Amino acid sequence: MENVNFTPKEILQKQFRQKMRGYDPDDVDSFLDNVIKDYDAFVKENQRLQDENERLLAKVDELTRQVQVGASQPRAAATSPASSNVTNMDILKRLSNLERHVFGSQLDNDPNESHRL
């Protein structure tokens, strides 16, 4: 808080000179008590927000590093889909053979009914 003129303690300890037709000291003290409470609340809120900002910046840095590390590592996942594609191809071939076996025998039994498939 670089642009702050007073600390809560300075506001609390401020003494005003009394003049003949001056302000009521009790009124001034009461008002300053309220000002100090507000000021103190603003200082705490400002500190909380600064702490949260630092925490979030640190998290952004951490996530950025994780992304950079992930981008620089060889893609193990890129080889994995290839093996799953082979597996998928095997499954598709088996399914095709099974369909030919099941539906092929039906087609052989009734050649006029083949259009229903």
Swiss-Prot record:
An example Gene Ontology CC term for this record: cytoplasm
Keyword presence, Secreted: no
Keywords: Cell cycle, Cell division, Cell shape, Coiled coil, Cytoplasm
Coiled-coil features, chain-numbered ranges: 32-70
Main location: cytoplasm
Highest taxon of the lineage: Bacteria
Compartments, as annotated in UniProt: Cytoplasm
GO process terms (BP): cell division; regulation of cell shape
Keyword Cell division: yes
HAMAP family in the record: GpsB
Family indicated by similarity: Belongs to the GpsB family.
Quaternary structure and interacting proteins, as annotated: Forms polymers through the coiled coil domains. Interacts with PBP1, MreC and EzrA.
Task performed by this protein: Divisome component that associates with the complex late in its assembly, after the Z-ring is formed, and is dependent on DivIC and PBP2B for its recruitment to the divisome. Together with EzrA, is a key component of the system that regulates PBP1 localization during cell cycle progression. Its main role could be the removal of PBP1 from the cell pole after pole maturation is completed. Also contributes to the recruitment of PBP1 to the division complex. Not essential for septum formation.
Protein name: Cell cycle protein GpsB
Biological source species: Levilactobacillus brevis (strain ATCC 367 / BCRC 12310 / CIP 105137 / JCM 1170 / LMG 11437 / NCIMB 947 / NCTC 947)
Gene from which this protein is expressed: gpsB
